[in-house]
Amino acid sequence: MLLLIQSSVLGQKPRARDIGIPFNGTTGKFNAITDVKGVEVGYSTIISGQGKNVRGKGPVRTGVTAILPRGKNNNPVFANWYSLNGNGEMTGTTWITESGFLETPIMITNTNSVGVVRDAVLKWFVKT
């Protein structure tokens, strides 16, 4: 029911079109996922502390991104998934494989936060 993807992006990377990879069609106004009607994206980032990392004290650099394929409409969307290299946590893929549907937001976070993000989304989902 819930799809969590580990994020490993360390910096801004060029977009495919920017480096000459061709795609059919035209981009939306912002060339972003939010150009798709009904899609909503939200995020939260925590940055705390500076200097050398001290275990248990920081500094902290973490966050979570939520993608709601149909916005606040909870109707399922057709879905599938693909594992590029098997690294990271992909919670919820069994349901997608069995049903072919995604019924919850797509959450992107670090591996250590997968459990707490899953729990928070399920609490939110029950309330809506």
Locations of the language-model features?
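Alpha/propeptide regions of enzymes that mature by internal proteolysis
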Residues: 11-128
